[in-house]
């Protein structure tokens, strides 16, 4: 009897029973946030800019099926406001071409260079994607992760929702699983 029980246990464990398989599409099943990202936002952002940052975080939270969650307070992510592009120079050799930069636990945004509210939100969604480990995506038009913010479709500037391609990129990087 003990031998039979051991054999069944070995068989079940080899089949992965009880293990959660990874999924490519976060919409395929409910997820859960394993670890909230504690963040702080520079006090120099005005209330409208802070609202765009909050909306961008919601895009990732909802678009990943809850696998990403942000919690105010903390230093996992620090979002800073810059007044001029040349302030990016210490971290970015191509600073003249950028309106934002993500490195490590920091996102720097050159606020005066972004006029349109939809563009601002799209820019923050893009930079949060980098913080989550996603690189530039050029194999589809419908993504926030283009190498140039002007390549982001206007529809994404207007309607803040995570495109399927960006959600799949998140799952490729973070190995999404289904909540039990």
What spans do the regions from the language model cover?
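A generic secondary-structure signal marking the coil-to-beta-strand transition
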Residues: 35-37, 105, 141
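Metzincin-family zinc-dependent endopeptidase catalytic domain
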Residues: 47-139, 150-152
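Disordered inhibitory propeptide/activation segment of secreted metzincin zinc metalloprotease zymogens
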Residues: 2-50, 55-58, 162, 171-180
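Post-HExxH zinc-binding segment in Zn-dependent metallohydrolases
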Residues: 146-178
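Short basic coil micro-motifs at the edges of alpha-helical modules that engage polyanionic partners
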Residues: 42, 111-114, 159-161
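Structural signal for conserved beta-strand scaffold positions within catalytic alpha/beta enzyme cores
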Residues: 41, 81, 146-147
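Mobile beta-alpha loop/short-helix "lid" or hinge segments that flank ligand
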Residues: 139-145
């Amino acid at each position: 009897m003990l031998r039979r029980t051991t054999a069944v246990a070995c068989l079940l464990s080899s089949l992965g029973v009880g293990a959660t398989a990874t999924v490519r599409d976060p919409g395929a099943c409910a997820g859960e946030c394993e670890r909230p990202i504690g963040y702080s936002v520079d006090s120099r952002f005005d209330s409208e800019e802070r609202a765009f940052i909050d909306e961008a975080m919601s895009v990732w939270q909802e678009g990943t099926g809850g696998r990403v969650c942000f919690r105010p307070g903390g230093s996992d992510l620090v979002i800073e406001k810059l007044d001029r592009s040349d302030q990016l120079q210490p971290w970015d050799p191509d600073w003249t071409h950028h309106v934002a930069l993500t490195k490590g636990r920091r996102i720097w945004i050159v606020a005066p260079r972004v006029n349109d509210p939809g563009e601002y939100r799209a820019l923050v969604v893009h930079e949060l994607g980098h913080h989550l480990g996603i690189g530039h995506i050029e194999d589809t038009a419908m993504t926030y992760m283009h190498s140039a913010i002007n390549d982001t479709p206007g529809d994404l500037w207007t309607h803040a929702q995570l495109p399927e391609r960006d959600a799949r990129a998140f799952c490729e990087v973070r190995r999404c699983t289904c909540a039990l």
